[in-house]
């Protein structure tokens, strides 16, 4: 008896553009053979706002409030890199106290970033409960930011060339210590609830695997790189701010799958709490900003003793010139390597401001790791990358 062959035509499916609160306005054009993904083409650019061009006609202090809109889950990292670029180019020293305050803010942001990744990722794979838990903890971080900067999620506008805008308010350190004491057991609670859950393990173990060589060749960074067996963290490599003063570990895994990426992020939250505790304990006295950056007049007429409007409010001087030269500055954000390539032209505006977003580079590998997986695994793999479209499209 002759066999009847069934041949199916590949089906092209549009996923997205999703709502910004999900994985951002990302559109995936997926080619399917039955349930299997043959090809995937990400379409980006729906959230492009010309952030690099805006930077080229704003002074630094005017531009800082804009930058929390790149990666709107990690506003502090964006602000830090925005002031680090001119600082390195103009060789401006940052006082020790300001460095410690910056580290505390950045690590709080790392926790908030990983929490905001964890909730929706769990919802993607079918676990709705942790989504509500993570918002409870993030709310506390936002309360701390509100006390220190006046704003919650974005637009903290806190970092300045040569330091921070204002000192920590009275009682803030104690509140932050309380948060650390509260948050540590909560991470254990997440682990108890999620890590050894058999349904969760079966759902994400072994999918979206990236080998060590692939991770390096595709230019991945952050938890994506560390989950593939590369022990690389810019806080240890570049020794920026004052991370060398603290005792902490770089966490990494070798499996390279979605579960490994989950483990790396969960453990990083614990390390962040460790760093914050040490920074709060050893917070030095002294100034929280470098006054030189606030100096209005320059050259021979500039006298430190006279009151001739050399200082203006709490801002960096509007006449602060970015010196001639070029520089690439990078830091380890919650998603990976966030970098700025700045070209100065002895002007108050930068001549070129190139943003190297971590999640944009991490998203490149998506079509490669989606080939051959089931259609149901697409959201789990996309979720494990941790992208924010504001940062991808800029």
Swiss-Prot record:
The keyword Ion transport does not apply. One of its GO terms (molecular function) is quinone binding. PROSITE patterns: COMPLEX1_49K. SUPFAM superfamilies: HydB/Nqo4-like. NDH-1 can be composed of about 15 different subunits; different subcomplexes with different compositions have been identified which probably have different functions. Its EC number is 7.1.1.-. GO terms for biological process: photosynthesis, light reaction. NDH-1 shuttles electrons from an unknown electron donor, via FMN and iron-sulfur (Fe-S) centers, to quinones in the respiratory and/or the photosynthetic chain. The immediate electron acceptor for the enzyme in this species is believed to be plastoquinone. Couples the redox reaction to proton translocation, and thus conserves the redox energy in a proton gradient. Cyanobacterial NDH-1 also plays a role in inorganic carbon-concentration. Belongs to the complex I 49 kDa subunit family. Keywords: Membrane, NAD, NADP, Plastoquinone, Quinone, Thylakoid, Translocase, Transport. NCBIfam families: NuoD, PRK06075.1, PRK07415.1. This is NAD(P)H-quinone oxidoreductase subunit H. It is a peripheral membrane protein. It catalyses: a plastoquinone + NADH + (n+1) H(+)(in) = a plastoquinol + NAD(+) + n H(+)(out); a plastoquinone + NADPH + (n+1) H(+)(in) = a plastoquinol + NADP(+) + n H(+)(out). GO terms for cellular component: plasma membrane-derived thylakoid membrane. Pfam families: Complex1_49kDa. InterPro entries: NADH_Q_OxRdtase_suD, NADH_UbQ_OxRdtase_49kDa_CS, NDH1_su_D/H, NiFe-Hase_large.
């Amino acid at each position: 008896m002759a066999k009847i062959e069934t041949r199916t035509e590949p089906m092209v499916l549009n996923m997205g553009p999703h709502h910004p609160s999900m994985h951002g306005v990302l559109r995936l054009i997926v080619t399917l053979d039955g349930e299997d993904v043959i090809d995937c083409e990400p379409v980006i650019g729906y959230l492009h706002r010309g952030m690099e061009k805006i930077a080229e006609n704003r002074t630094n202090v005017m531009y800082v409030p804009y930058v929390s809109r790149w990666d709107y889950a990690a506003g502090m990292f964006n602000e830090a890199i925005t002031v680090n670029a001119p600082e390195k180019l103009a060789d401006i020293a940052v006082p020790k106290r300001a460095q410690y305050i910056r580290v505390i803010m950045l690590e709080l942001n790392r926790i908030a970033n990983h929490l905001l990744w964890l909730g929706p990722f769990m919802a993607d794979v079918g676990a709705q409960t942790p989504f509500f838990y993570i918002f409870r903890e993030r709310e506390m971080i936002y309360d701390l930011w509100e006390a220190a900067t006046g704003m919650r999620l974005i637009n903290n506008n806190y970092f300045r060339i040569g330091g921070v805008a204002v000192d920590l308010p009275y009682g803030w350190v104690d509140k932050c210590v309380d948060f650390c004491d509260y948050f540590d057991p909560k991470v254990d609670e997440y682990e108890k609830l999620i890590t050894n859950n058999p349904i969760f393990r079966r759902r994400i173990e072994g999918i979206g695997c990236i080998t060590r060589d692939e991770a390096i060749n595709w230019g991945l960074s952050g938890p994506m790189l560390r989950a593939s067996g590369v022990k690389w963290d810019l806080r240890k490599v570049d020794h920026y701010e004052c991370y060398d003063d603290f005792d902490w570990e770089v966490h990494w895994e070798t499996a390279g799958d979605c579960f490994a990426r989950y483990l790396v992020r969960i453990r990083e939250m614990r390390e962040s709490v460790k760093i914050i505790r040490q920074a709060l304990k050893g917070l030095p006295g002294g100034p929280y900003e470098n006054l030189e950056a606030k100096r209005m007049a320059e050259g021979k007429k500039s006298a430190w003793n006279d009151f001739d409007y050399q200082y203006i409010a709490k801002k960096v001087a509007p006449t602060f010139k970015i010196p001639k030269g070029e520089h690439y500055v990078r830091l380890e954000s919650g998603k990976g390597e966030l970098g700025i390539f700045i070209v100065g032209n002895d002007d108050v505006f930068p001549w070129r401001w190139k943003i190297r977003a971590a999640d944009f580079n991490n998203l490149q590998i998506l079509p490669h790791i989606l080939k051959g997986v089931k259609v149901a695994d697409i959201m789990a793999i996309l979720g494990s990358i941790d992208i924010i479209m504001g940062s991808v499209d800029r």
